[in-house]
Amino acid sequence: MRTDSKTPLLDTIATPTDLRRLKESDLAQLADELRTETIDAVSVTGGHLGAGLGVVELTVALHYVFDTPHDRLIWDVGHQAYPHKILTGRRDRIRTLRRAGGLSGFTKRSESVYDPFGTAHSSTSISAGLGMAAATTLSGGNNNVIAVIGDGSMSAGMAYEAMNNAGAMHSRLIIILNDNEMSIAPPAGALSAYLARLVSGGTYRTVREAAKQLGRHLPHFIYDRARKTEEFARNFWAGGTMFEELGIYYVGPIDGHNLDHLLPVLKNVRDFKETGPILVHVVTQKGKGYAPAAAASDKYHSVNTFDVVTGVQTKPKANAPSYTRVFADALVKEAERDDKIVAITAAMPGGTGLDVFGKAFPERTFDVGIAEQHAVTFAAGLATEGYRPFCALYSTFLQRGYDQVVHDVAIQNLPVRFAIDRAGLVGADGATHAGSFDVSYLGILPNMVIMAAADEAELVHMVATAAAYDEGPIAFRYPRGEGVGIELPQIGEILDIGRGRIVREGTTVALLSLGTRLAEASKAAEQLASYGISVTVADARFAKPLDLDLVRRLAKNHEVLITIEEGSVGGFGSFVMQALAEEGLLDGTGLKFRSMVLPDTFLDHDKPEKLYAQAGLDAKGIVAKVLATLGRENEAHQSLIA
């Protein structure tokens, strides 16, 4: 063991098997060292810090008590999984988190056998764990299944659906409720820890079950009164009535940072073989053990690289405001003139910019929790009463409320405004957070209008257009990160629905862009001029309805028409192809049509600009596509390697 190391005990741990060889008295030191290593690693890579620091002791205890990976351990969302990764054979790569070719910022099945289920979106762990538990029963296995879920994730309906099913199935599933917001119970003390150890023990549960069997032979009113007395006494001290009503045996709350409390309870839960789900309620603190993160958990939930000593984060100087901030400021200006404008977010006020709107109009701002289905239908309800709701969600999270978009909004043609943030590729969070599919899945819906901002000034216009549009649902999408630095209008212009614009006139090739690929299309046009190719560049603005006049003009007046978008197959390019086919513009006209979309694969984490280059959606890729389409393959190849 190295004597000069800051983490001498952790240095001896390659896998949880090594951890389980330690004495219990060593675990507190191991937890301290694991916390130190987590802080140091995230200071280098950036990422989700506070949640991981809050579960260090819990992570150590779970891997010590349970036989992972034979016992399945699922981390809901995965923000808190960095300490888990360090203990499960990935410490040597922990400083590659969220970088190209490095570790994912979430749990990932292809990364480790210790990650039995991939996560990133919230509230999935209980459902997945219940499926694993049912499979264990069917196959006659004996492994435990443990799902760790935070109290924030418990606001999603999926978690309650899973718990309701778990209680009815009587499958053996262990749920760890990580309460790090004090939203369910106050801090746990010695008495509650003692009671948790008592009621989780085999003796108590065996006697309780025997009493139930005996009670069934007593007169009903006596049995019922005894049952209620026992439940009242236990829940008075420990809480958990709601879980018991769902058929889940509740234990807790206990201090999630006290190993002397955690270990005996987890051992009792592990060793008692009665079927049925168990929930262990642990109370933790986000950012535990690192003063800057503990003092400002919201600011240290997700961080840039930072100085470990001071906690000061490294933030590159912005060259332009972010699209998110431009949206927020534009919405505030619209709301100053229209008191019917309201805003809805699903537990992401800061991420969507609605914290800015909330400061200006707190009574008109609704944070509904991690509940996208509810958010969409809640917005629909507001729309029925004459309000103008803006439902601001990340593209990837809007997927979670898709049936509500179809059934509650589109079919009823209600004027809900969808502000779709993080459209396109997002970078370090990878495939789970990419906004690749919204144009495809919204564009097939009757009544839906879809816009995509080419730059931040266009976004201001689209906010104004959405605010003024009362004929039905309307969506506008925009990416993560900074704008291009264009001057912003003071007041947004209301755009003509379904009308695009020409930004550069040419004669041979037409590039029809949707969204922020417009800048790359314009660069490509400049480069293609050196090849003697005259290029028209157009901004579609609308994916639906299409500007058919513009499409006809581009198709009839050019040899080549190429659509470019930051989305998957089945989106804007497919809509244009359908229109061309219906108009007969592909019938022996000689037009060469191509569609540039994201590849039919899930792209891993990297910087967005590198991912777009990988997908061929940068200026170099567009130049190569044009040259190849014109039959100049050698030049196309040379342009890519230049």
Swiss-Prot record:
PROSITE patterns (alphabetical): TRANSKETOLASE_1, TRANSKETOLASE_2
One GO molecular function term?
magnesium ion binding
The positions annotated for binding Mg(2+) are: D151, N180
* Positions of thiamine diphosphate binding: H79, A120, H121, S122, G152, S153, N180, Y290, E372
Under catalytic activity, the entry for this protein gives: D-glyceraldehyde 3-phosphate + pyruvate + H(+) = 1-deoxy-D-xylulose 5-phosphate + CO2
The gene coding this protein? dxs
Keyword hit for Metal-binding: yes
Name of this chain's protein: 1-deoxy-D-xylulose-5-phosphate synthase
- Native source organism of the sequence: Beijerinckia indica subsp. indica (strain ATCC 9039 / DSM 1715 / NCIMB 8712)
Which family, according to the similarity comment?
Belongs to the transketolase family. DXPS subfamily.
Query: What keywords are assigned to this protein?
Result: Isoprene biosynthesis, Magnesium, Metal-binding, Thiamine biosynthesis, Thiamine pyrophosphate, Transferase
> What detail does the entry give on cofactor binding?
Binds 1 Mg(2+) ion per subunit. Binds 1 thiamine pyrophosphate per subunit.
Query: Could you tell me which SMART domains the record lists for this protein?
Result: Transket_pyr
Name the coenzymes or cofactors required.
Mg(2+); thiamine diphosphate
Q: In which pathway does it act?
A: Metabolic intermediate biosynthesis; 1-deoxy-D-xylulose 5-phosphate biosynthesis; 1-deoxy-D-xylulose 5-phosphate from D-glyceraldehyde 3-phosphate and pyruvate: step 1/1
**Biological process (GO) annotations?**
1-deoxy-D-xylulose 5-phosphate biosynthetic process; glyceraldehyde-3-phosphate metabolic process; terpenoid biosynthetic process; thiamine biosynthetic process
Q: What is its EC number?
A: 2.2.1.7
Q: How does it assemble?
A: Homodimer.
